[in-house]
Design a protein with these regions (language model features):
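Conserved hydrophobic positions within beta-strands
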Residues: 42-44, 95
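OB-fold/S1-family single-stranded nucleic acid-binding modules
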Residues: 103-128
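Disordered, low-complexity segments in secreted/periplasmic proteins that are enriched in proline
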Residues: 129-139
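Bacterial N-terminal signal peptides that target proteins for export
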Residues: 1-11
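Short nucleic-acid-contacting surface segments enriched for D/E, G, S/T with interspersed K/R
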Residues: 82-98
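Bacterial N-terminal signal peptides
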Residues: 9-19
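Short aromatic-glycine-enriched beta-strand elements
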Residues: 50-60
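Short boundary/loop segments of OB/S1/cold-shock single-stranded nucleic-acid-binding domains
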Residues: 23-38
Length: 139
């Protein structure tokens, strides 16, 4: 094998080694089940505005009266920031509706590809929801 071919082989291997984990990270189907949509109405209890995704904990009153906290995965903070969203736009205690898909893991309270709709109708889109993380910024 020539030196040029060897360098090309090594470069290709490095690129593949670096991009495979990134692709796996963004494979929604690895963690979430698109055949299990879920709609939640509840109160924001916690917001984690950190990379690589924001997470919003939403407390929901189940039909039997028990309170359950769901962890809703959102888009990347920088994506939302570029659209005009800020950490302060969602508030602890705010009533929201969440539309997303359930996690595959039994017993998991994680929700992916979620759209969070505030009481005044603003929408914040999660990774892959609504055609990506695009959505109107707060008014």
């Amino acid at each position: 094998m020539s030196l040029k071919a060897s360098i090309l082989s090594v470069a290709t291997a490095v690129v593949l080694a670096v991009t495979a984990p990134v692709a796996a990270h963004h494979a929604v189907s690895a963690e979430f089940d698109s055949t299990k949509p879920i709609t939640l109405k509840g109160t924001i209890k916690r917001i984690e505005w950190t990379n690589p995704h924001i997470y919003t904990n939403v407390e929901v009153k189940e039909p039997d009266g028990t309170l359950v906290v769901y962890r809703v995965e959102g888009a990347a903070p920088n994506t939302l920031f570029r659209q005009g969203w800020r950490k302060e736009d969602l508030k602890i205690g705010e009533l929201v509706t969440v539309n997303g898909i359930r996690a595959k893991a039994a017993g998991s309270m994680n929700v992916g590809q979620a759209t969070i709709t505030t009481a005044d109708g603003r929408k914040i889109y999660g990774q892959g929801a609504g055609g990506g993380a695009r959505g109107p910024a707060p008014q």
